[in-house]
C-alpha cells in the first residue's frame, strides 16, 4: 500500500517520500507511485507489475511526463533516473 511504501522510503532513503512531496506537490498519485517504486530500485518491468500490471511502455511514458511536470532538464529513462537520484541526495 502507498502509505507503507512512503513510510519505508522515509526510513530507508533519507526521507525520500516527504522530500519528493514537499518539493513537487503537483505530482499526482500515479506519478508519486512511479517515483516511489523507482526509488526502491525496481526495474521498469517490476514497476509496471507493481503499479497495477500496466505496460512497460506506459511506465516509460510516465517517466518522461514526470520529468516534464517537474521541469527537469533531462527526460526519458535516463532523465528520470537522474531526477530520482537527485531527490535521493538532497
Locate the predicted segments by residue.
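Cytosolic nucleotide-binding catalytic cores of signal-transduction proteins
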Residues: 2-90
Amino acid at each position: 500500500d502507498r502509505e507503507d511504501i512512503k513510510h519505508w522510503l522515509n526510513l530507508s532513503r533519507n526521507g525520500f517520500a516527504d522530500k519528493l512531496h514537499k518539493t513537487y506537490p503537483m505530482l499526482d498519485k500515479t506519478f508519486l507511485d512511479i517515483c516511489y517504486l523507482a526509488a526502491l530500485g525496481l526495474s521498469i518491468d517490476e514497476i509496471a507489475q507493481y503499479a497495477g500490471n500496466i505496460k512497460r511502455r506506459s511506465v516509460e511514458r510516465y517517466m518522461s511526463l514526470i520529468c516534464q511536470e517537474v521541469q527537469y532538464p533531462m527526460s526519458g529513462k535516463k532523465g528520470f533516473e537522474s531526477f530520482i537520484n537527485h531527490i535521493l541526495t538532497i
